[in-house]
């Protein structure tokens, strides 16, 4: 859909959920950062001069707001519409007060769905694998001739892609799914459900309820793709997958699992295949198994998701900085080639460790603990460990990478140095991407020193 294909208005957006979006009143962007910047650009494109609020705005964000004509908000005022960033809890005091004064509180996903109702969206959520599955679905749809763009919880923000896509493939976090009441997706995917974000949701039940909002607005003509062992209440048609087979809805095998490229997880590929098929059928497009098979063979894994970033002799270095959920860390431990030097650290968010002990048994030779809660996590894991102390995140990562390599025997050693940190990045880094970049830089530095010493890399 090209920009302007759906009529725009500064008064009222298209109806969805039986309610209009009031862009003619006072609109507040609550929270900047990646999502807020996407909202700001989108509203500017709609001809809307909005207000914004952020407790600690970055100088570049303030400059962008001025450039786009958005003004800093007075929270003592009243607003008709508040577009809140996903990281702002739904029960935040400011939002409760604003709602009490008559504001409607929504998120970027609801804004996109209401103002671009003709754009088909595939929504993907889950505790682990949702980003990789999102990218895979978009790759498959592009191979089938559709202009599919991925966005949402992964880069870029959803609102950055809605005017340059025939199909939006949207990764949806539990935070985003708290603000999409009634969202109807022709195709929705749940990759799995584990434990995460208890600091935000308070309980596993509340976290799972937020995730299941992805199918709450679906109807009998829509499709929900889910794991075969995960029952989900829904009005949609249910299609299930397992990691053992890459097949279409009728059971026809498209590709042997063994033919997937390295770094592409079979469960993610199986879910992506079924979702792509469902969307093609929704649009009345042909489903060609040969095209889909070729696309799977050529699939590109997502950077920073269990990615091999270096090799020094028989020791590989794998970056999985985003692996902070138990289910994701467990998957990384089971996939990595043993023996493993496991880099664990960051800020503990209450991950369940028992499954990780089981996955590490007989595979992990040493835990390298770094960051704010690394030592505490290592002690709770009950595995042999050493603690890295450093002033900065980069220095900590340099030492952790070298310690991991040495734990595997250094030159002449074998195995995997695995960054699957369990803890979040916010103790020493801006986000998981910056932490992953630090790991990559540390690996390259180590490779450089060893190459200079005559070792093969």
Curated annotation (Swiss-Prot):
ATP binds at residues 126-132. It is an enzyme of class 6 (ligase). Keywords: ATP-binding, Cell cycle, Cell division, Cell shape, Cell wall biogenesis/degradation, Cytoplasm, Ligase, Nucleotide-binding, Peptidoglycan synthesis. The keyword Thylakoid does not apply. InterPro entries: Mur-like_cat_sf, Mur_ligase_C, Mur_ligase_C_dom_sf, Mur_ligase_cen, MurD. It catalyses: UDP-N-acetyl-alpha-D-muramoyl-L-alanine + D-glutamate + ATP = UDP-N-acetyl-alpha-D-muramoyl-L-alanyl-D-glutamate + ADP + phosphate + H(+). This is UDP-N-acetylmuramoylalanine--D-glutamate ligase. It comes from Deinococcus radiodurans (strain ATCC 13939 / DSM 20539 / JCM 16871 / CCUG 27074 / LMG 4051 / NBRC 15346 / NCIMB 9279 / VKM B-1422 / R1).
